[in-house]
Amino acid sequence: MQYNLTRIDPDAPNEQYPIGKRETVSDPLEDQVHKNIYMGKLEDVLNGAVNWGRKNSLWPYNFGLSCCYVEMTTAFTAPHDIARFGAEVIRASPRQADFMVIAGTCFIKMAPIIQRLYEQMLEPKWVISMGSCANSGGMYDIYSVVQGVDKFLPVDVYVPGCPPRPEAFLQGLMLLQESIGKERRPLSWVVGDQGVYRAEMPSQKEQRREQRIQVTNLRSPDEV
């Protein structure tokens, strides 16, 4: 499995965000196992335990921009029960949150505010882009709307839709949990490699292409 390695680059230009450099590498734990099988397996178990705790206790930051935020908050109601994924503890401060959901239209005037809120979150932190407007600007191809929040934030999961249903948001949350379970992060600021390794996650569109091609009985709009 290929991983995307991100390291802090203090010499990067100020307009670059995040300040770091990225490259594609192999799984660092597999390399460690080849060097020393005992230490490699021990590090694998420790990473697995830490990632299990992180992905099953994701605290979201209570933040929204537009109509997609309404669908996001609907996922916290009893019929959907987001507590099944350990993400029901909504935080009012970014310093106490684990991930931020950019739900709605991001205007240029809001971009520096969102970036400041992201910087106030403690590591490790993740970002979910929810809705067409957050993903690519949506139907607002105008001067005042940012054409995708990944222009200034590192996005981990994209949830399509205008607006996405709460079930789509829950699926995006599960994809984020799957990604966190495969991450390789430093266990301490003084121990091990300080780079962040993220597994390459293929799009669901590509993964389900064969499944869509095999469908012959298409449902009518009234049945969807």
Curated annotation (Swiss-Prot):
Cofactor entry: [4Fe-4S] cluster
Pfam families in UniProt: Oxidored_q6
Primary location group: membrane
Gene Ontology CC: one annotated term: plasma membrane
Stretches with biased composition (Basic and acidic residues): 203-212
Reactions it catalyzes: a quinone + NADH + 5 H(+)(in) = a quinol + NAD(+) + 4 H(+)(out)
Topological category with respect to the lipid bilayer: Peripheral membrane protein
Gene Ontology process terms (BP): aerobic respiration; electron transport coupled proton transport
Biased composition annotated in UniProt, kind: Polar residues: 213-224
Cofactor, free-text remark: Binds 1 [4Fe-4S] cluster.
UniProt binding sites for [4Fe-4S] cluster: C67, C68, C133, C162
Region feature Disordered, mapped onto this chain: 201-224
Keywords: 4Fe-4S, Cell inner membrane, Cell membrane, Iron, Iron-sulfur, Membrane, Metal-binding, NAD, Quinone, Translocase, Transport, Ubiquinone
Enzyme Commission no: 7.1.1.-
Molecular-function annotations in GO: 4 iron, 4 sulfur cluster binding; iron ion binding; NADH dehydrogenase (ubiquinone) activity; NADH:ubiquinone reductase (non-electrogenic) activity; quinone binding
InterPro entries referenced in this protein's UniProt entry, alphabetically: NADH_UbQ_OxRdtase-like_20kDa, NADH_UQ_OxRdtase_20Kd_su
Cellular location(s): Cell inner membrane
Record-stated family: Belongs to the complex I 20 kDa subunit family.
Complexes and interactors: NDH-1 is composed of 13 different subunits. Subunits NuoB, CD, E, F, and G constitute the peripheral sector of the complex.
PANTHER family attached to this UniProt entry: NADH DEHYDROGENASE, NADH DEHYDROGENASE [UBIQUINONE] IRON-SULFUR PROTEIN 7, MITOCHONDRIAL
Function: NDH-1 shuttles electrons from NADH, via FMN and iron-sulfur (Fe-S) centers, to quinones in the respiratory chain. The immediate electron acceptor for the enzyme in this species is believed to be ubiquinone. Couples the redox reaction to proton translocation (for every two electrons transferred, four hydrogen ions are translocated across the cytoplasmic membrane), and thus conserves the redox energy in a proton gradient.
The protein's name in its UniProt record: NADH-quinone oxidoreductase subunit B
Organism: Pseudomonas syringae pv. tomato (strain ATCC BAA-871 / DC3000)
